[in-house]
Amino acid sequence: MSTIPGFNQIQFEGFCRFIDQGLTEELSKFPKIEDTNQEIDFELFLERYQLVEPSIKERDAVYESLTYSSELYVSARLIWKNDRRRYIQEQTILIGKIPLMTSLGAFIVNGIYRIVINQILQSPGIYYQSELNDNGISVYTGTIISDWGGRLELEIDRKTRIWVRVSRQQKLSILVLLSAMGLNIREILENVCYPELFLSFLNDKKQIGSKENAILEFYQQFACVEGDPVFSESLSKDLQKKFFQQRCELGGIGRRNMNRRLNLDIPQNNTFLLPRDILAAADRLIRIKFGMGTLDDMNHLQNKRIRSVADLLQEQFGLALVRLENMARGNIYAALKHNWTPTPQNLVNSTPLTDTYKVFFRLHPLSQVLDRTNPLTQIVHGRKLSYLGPGGLTARTATFPIRDIHPSHYGRICPIDTSEGINVGLIGSLAIHARIGRWGSLESPFYKISERSKGARMLYLSPGRDEYYMVAAGNSLALNQGIQEEQVVPARYRQEFLTIAWEQVHLRSIFSFQYFSIGASLIPFIEHNDANRALMSSNMQRQAVPLSQSEKCIVGTGLEGQAALDSGALAIAEHEGEIIYTDTDKILLSGNGDTLRIPLVMYQRSNKNTCMHQKPQVQRGKCIKKGQILAYGAATVGGELALGKNVLVAYMPWEGYNFEDAVLISERLVYEDIYTSFHIRKYEIQINQGSERVTNEIPHLEVHLLRNLDKNGIVMLGSWVETGDILVGKLTPQMVKESSYAPEDRLLRTILGMRVYTSKETCLKLPIGGRGRVIDVRWVQSSKTDETEKTESIRVYILQKREIKVGDKVAGRHGNKGIISKILPRQDMPYLQDGRPVDMVFNPLGVPSRMNVGQIFESSLGLAGGLLDRHYRIAPFDERYEQEASRKLVFSELYEASKQTVNPWIFEPESPGKSRIFDGRTGDPFEQPVIIGKPYILKLIHQVDDKIHGRSSGRYSRLTQQPLKGRAKKGGQRVGEMEVWALEGFGVAYILQEMLTYKSDHIRARQEVLGTIIFGGRIPTPEDAPESFRLFVRELRSLALELNHFLVSEKTFQLNRKEA
C-alpha cells in the first residue's frame, strides 16, 4: 500500500512552483525600457534574483502584527548615452517583498494567518454543445474559451451556415472573421474539408469584397461603434491588439487542449488564436452536425483546470511588474526633464510589489483567514476547491448540474465534503490521494495490473484517461497475487459501473479512503450512513472545540495520526539528540554539537477564540530520534487527533427532555471537567498619539470599575475581570460648545483667546459575557508613512474557562447533533446493571429516519473497547471482505467483553447490543432494553455563552424609535408572536397590553413607566398611540394608503343607553 501524501503538500508544491518557475516566467516578460530619445535603457536580468531570509520569525510576526515576507532582489542594468559617451551601471536592486508560506501552508499578513484556496475554472480550449432553440430544433455550437475567460462562439444553422458571436453579441458570418484575420476566399476554401458548404456564403448579396471591408465590419460589431468607421492601419492594429492578442489568448493549457481536440500540431509556444484553429473548429462543427463526432461534457473534470496558489501569486506578481514598469518609465522621464542622474535603484522602489500583495491577501475572495478552530480545520481549509471567485461562477447563477457529483470526481474530489446552504456543490474538498498535475488537472493514483510482472505499478491518471481502462471499484485491494480473487468484481468503465471477470481488470484503487476527503475519512463506519449525515459530520468535526482534557477515540479510522502530524499542532524533533532542558515555554535539544531551542505554543488565541497550547512530553536527559513527538498540541493525544470524549450513552426517551434532538447529560460532565474548554478573547482599543491619553484617573466612574488598572491605566496581568470593568482607561479631549461656557470661561476666551477643553471618557470596557482572567496585554505601535497618522493600539487577552451547560451544542461523528436541554444529578440518571450511571441520553428516534446507523456500530464497539481497554482502527467498506463484516466485528467484541468482565448483560443473544437499565430516581427497570454504548462525542463552537442575550433597557433607533438589532449593539426586539400566544394562554391581558404598547415603544410613556416602577405608584395610561402604530401608519403612507386614526378614551367616548 502506498504512503498517504502530506495533507499540506498541495499548498507547499504550489508555492514552490511559484518560486521556482513563476518568478522566472514573469521576470522574462519584463520589457527593456527606453525613453523616446533612446538616451536611457533599463532592463532586469531574470537569471540573477534572490530571496533574502526573513528578518523575523513566524511567532514574532504573529505577536507583533507584521507580515512574514522575504525581500526580492533582482540584478538590473542602466545604460545612459549622453554626449557620445556611454555609461553602464549594474546593480542589485530591491523590487519588493513577497509573503512567504509558513509550515502550516498559510501566509502571515499583518499578524493574521491567511490561506489561498484553489479554484476550479473552465479550462481554455474549444467545447461543442447542442441546445434546443425556441422552435425545439437542436442548434450545435462550438465555444472557444480564452485563457482569461473570454468567449468566441461558432454556431451552425439549419442551412449549415456558420456564424460567429463574440462575447454573446450579435452574430456575423465566419467569412468576416477569417477575412479579418488575413485569409482570402481562396485560402479558406482550400483549407477546409467541406468547401461546398462555405460557398453558400459567396452567393449572399452581402459578399465580403476585401480584407479591409471585413476588418471594418468585424470592428464595428466587436467594438460596438456607431456609424461607418473608416479603415486605417491604426484601426487594424487596434483590432489585432485588443481582440486577436488580448481576448483570444489561449495560454499554454488552451493551446494544448485545442491541439488535442482538433488534432492540430501547432507549436506549444504559439498561444494565440490562429486562422488555422478557426478552420479546424468549423470542420469539426460540421461533422458533429451530421453525427460524426461527440459533444463535450462541460462538467467533466478533463474540461476543468485548477487555479492553484502558484497561479494566483504569479498573476499578482505580473501585475506588480507592470506597475513597476510604469514607475520606471515615469522616473526616466523625470530624470531627463529635471536633469538628475538616475541609478537602477532610484528608478524603482518596493511599493508596487509590496502593495499589490497586500491588497491581494486582504481583498481577494480566494484569500481567506485561516480557520484555526482545531487542528483538523487548519488542514481541511487548505485543501478546499472553489467554483466561486474572479473568473468563476456565482452562487446565484450556478445550476444544479454544476453542483452535482460527476463520475470524473472519483478519487479526485470528495463526493461527501461540501458546504451546506447556497454554496452546496460549489465548495468542495480534495480527495486524500489527489494531486494537481502539470497542466492544472486533478490526478488520482491507481495500481496497474500486469500479467507479466507479479507486482503492481502505481500511476497517476488525469481525468478522462481512466475512462479507457476497466477500473476495479475497490473490492480487491490486496497486492499479494497468491490470494484467490473473486471471479466477478464490480468495475468502472466510461462512467458506467459494470460487473466483469477479474482477468479483464486493468486498474484498481490503491486505498479504501481514496475517494474521500480528510473530514469524511475520519468517520468510522461511514458506509452505513446516509450521505447527507456524513456531510454534516465532515463539517461539524471542523467546529469541534479543543478540550482541556483531550481523549483519543476508541473507534477510529487510522488517519488520526497523520491528521495531527500534518496540522502543525505537534512539536516534532527535527534532529536527534538529548533533551537538556524542558519547561512549559521551550525545550532545549543538544545534538551534533549544537543546542537547538524549540519554542512551544503557550495559550495562543485562534481566530475562533479557541485556545492553542502545547504540552511537553519529554523529560530531561532523554535521548530522542528525528521525527519523534516532543509536545502534544491542542486536541491531540498520543500523536493522534483527539477532538472529543468517549462517554457512556443510552438511546432512550427520558421525560421528553431529549425530544427533537435535545440531549440530556449528567452533572459528572460538568464537575469532572469532561467537556471543559478554554477560550481566549481579544479586546483592542486604538489610541491617537498626542490628543488622547491613557490614565487610571477617570472622572465620574465608580471606583470598583477601576480596581484592576495599574498606574498607567492598563489592566494588570492575572486580574479577574467582570462585565463592565475598565480594561484600558482613556480620555479623549473635546472642545466645549459656546453655549455651555461658564462666565469665567467666557471671560478667558474673550480676553486671552483661549479655548476651553474638557475630556470625554472613551475607555475600553469589558462587554457582556466577557468575564475571565487577563493573560496578556500588548501595546502595539503601527508605523505609517505619514507621521501624523501614527496610531497605537492596546490589546488585552482574556482567558475564559467554560464548562458544558444548557444550550451548548454537541455532536457525534455521524451527523447526530443536539442541544443540551437539562443537566441531571448523577443519582437521577439511568444506570447500568453494574451500577454505573450513563453520561448522556440520546433520542432513539433520531437514528432510523436519518439513516445514520454508523453511530450504533460505533457506540457498541466503543463500549466493548472501553471494557477491554482496546482501541480500534477500522477502514470503511469492510463488507468487501465478507457480508455483515461490521456487525460480526461488533458482536464478537461485545461477546468477548462480556466473557472477560463476567457481565452477561453486555451481550445478550436475545437483544445483542441492548441492555436493560434502571431509572435512577426510583430504581425500577425500564420496560424495554435499550442500546448503550461509548461513542465519541464532540463539543462544538456553537456555545450558549456566545449567543444568549437579553435586555431590559437600551438604545433605540432614532428614526423608528424601535430597539436596535443584534447582540453586539445590546439590542432587543418586541414581543414576538409566540410570546404573545404564551401570555394569552395565561390570560394576563393587562401585562400583554403593557408590553405591546406603552412599555415597549411609547416615547414618553416608557420613561414614566420606568420611574413609577422605581419609585412606586400607579402606572400612567398614555393618551396617544405608541410609536410602533405610528410607524405602521407611515409604512402604509409610503404605499399610497392613507390611514386616519384617533384614540378612544373615557373622556372622548360617550354612550347613550336606552332601557329596553
Swiss-Prot record:
Gene Ontology CC entries for this record: chloroplast; DNA-directed RNA polymerase complex; mitochondrion
Highest rank taxon of the organism: Eukaryota
CDD domains from the UniProt entry: RNA_pol_B_RPB2
Catalytic activity: RNA(n) + a ribonucleoside 5'-triphosphate = RNA(n+1) + diphosphate
EC number annotated for this UniProt entry: 2.7.7.6
Pfam families linked to this entry: RNA_pol_Rpb2_1, RNA_pol_Rpb2_2, RNA_pol_Rpb2_3, RNA_pol_Rpb2_6, RNA_pol_Rpb2_7
Listed PANTHER family: DNA-DIRECTED RNA POLYMERASE I SUBUNIT 2 (PTHR20856)
HAMAP family in alphabetical order: RNApol_bact_RpoB
Assembly notes: In plastids the minimal PEP RNA polymerase catalytic core is composed of four subunits: alpha, beta, beta', and beta''. When a (nuclear-encoded) sigma factor is associated with the core the holoenzyme is formed, which can initiate transcription.
Protein name: DNA-directed RNA polymerase subunit beta
Lineage: Eukaryota, Viridiplantae, Streptophyta, Embryophyta, Tracheophyta
Gene this protein is translated from: rpoB
